[in-house]
């Protein structure tokens, strides 16, 4: 079985944890970090049933950078 390395981010939003895959922009959520990642894994498995892993955008060394957004 082949494998692909994917970059993911998890954060708490209200009562839930949100998980986001940076390579595909697919997200999921759960009551814990582990549950959010497990649900993301399931969503990615469904996604890759119809899409080639080569379609995943390559993300190397992602960095979280703060940005102040000004709006009216």
Protein language model features and the residues they cover:
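A short, exposed loop/beta-hairpin motif centered on an aromatic-Gly-Thr core
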Residues: 24-33
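Short, charged, surface-exposed hinge/linker loops at domain edges
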Residues: 1-5, 34, 38-72
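Compositionally biased, intrinsically disordered low-complexity segments
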Residues: 12-13, 29, 67-72
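Short aromatic-glycine-(Arg/Gly/Cys) micro-motifs in beta-strand/loop hairpins
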Residues: 4, 9-21
